[in-house]
Amino acid sequence: MIDSLDVSYGDMWGSHEGPTHPNPIPNALAARRHEAGMAYAVLLSSRERPLAMVERWPRGMWRVYLFDDATRRVRMIDFKPFGTGMLLAHRNTRLTGGDEETSTVEVLSCRAPEFGDWQVFAPFLAQQGHEPAPTVVLNDVSVDEGAGPLRPTGIEQLFVPGPRDTPDGPAVVELGDAGAVRITSGRLAVSDPGWVSEPRTVTVPPGEYPVTLALLRRTPWLRVAAAKVTLLDAPPHAWEMALRPDEDPELLGEGEFYGVGVDTGTVAFLDATRTVSEEALDEEVFLPLSFDDRPGVELPGTETEPNLIAFSAGWGDGSYPVWIGRTEDGQACCVVVDLRLYPSDEEKQVPGGPKPSHA
């Protein structure tokens, strides 16, 4: 009979298989995500053996996975809101070697849990042959609160030319002039040029601003390690992550960040009002950037629209942090995209290296 469960928290598992979280998070971070209606996972274990993994989904949906003795997820129970403050178990699926077999659920409903109220799911352990005691004690074994979101360490060093040690061996940083981006609307956008409808924006005075590329050269390749728009001829006193209005850094785990999402292997600086046709992208951006000796390209403006400066995104698709450098009096003096070709000194000290991001 199971009278106690160890509780830990993490990001959603996806296709991960194993006895522990692929990316554990602290109790306090999970609680903040719960309050914000965001997704997270709860692992319920006994004697270091996983019994159930509970996933909190948007719109009040929940999912419980049950494990077998070999720590494989073999059963999946889906819950949806039912009445006031209740959940209905509407689907019970047996997972067998890639196949799914649906059966009835013996316990049809339970309370919708408040954060930490995981005893409500204990009766469902019986679906896998476990007998919970009338009262189940929960023991919090989640990881300690870490250092928080990714910090802007070493941003200035990205643009210092000279030799570098990288995970792939020695390389050299060179600086390249990518031209000047013209901003007419007062909003500088950072975006994948193929998806300019959802950019990350920074408020700047209208004008033309030089774009500098930090190029990492290691025979036989040349990659863009970072890109910078210089807004003022003044050094940054502090750095801040470029955020959308609905983004809260308090909801990020250790080493995580909100960044610009990339699906075409390309990032661009542009005015927030600029639109781009697929034909222009293919012929004037993606094709030129496909050559190794062409890391950056300008898509010229028209009579009605300003130009666009595009460049290859590090190793390709993914998400990359955007940092705003501010002077001592708070003015934005530069905007930098770190394309993450090599970890900062801070990340080298974090177990597992760079953490997941949110585009």
Give short role names for the model-derived ranges.
Residues F115, E131-D282:
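Extended, low-hydrophobicity segments enriched in charged/polar residues
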Residues L66-D68, F79-F82, A89-N92, L188, ...:
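Surface-exposed beta-strand edges and their flanking turn/coil or helix-capping segments
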Residues L43, M53-V54, V211-L213, A227, ...:
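Generic structural hydrophobic/aromatic packing signal, biased to beta-strands
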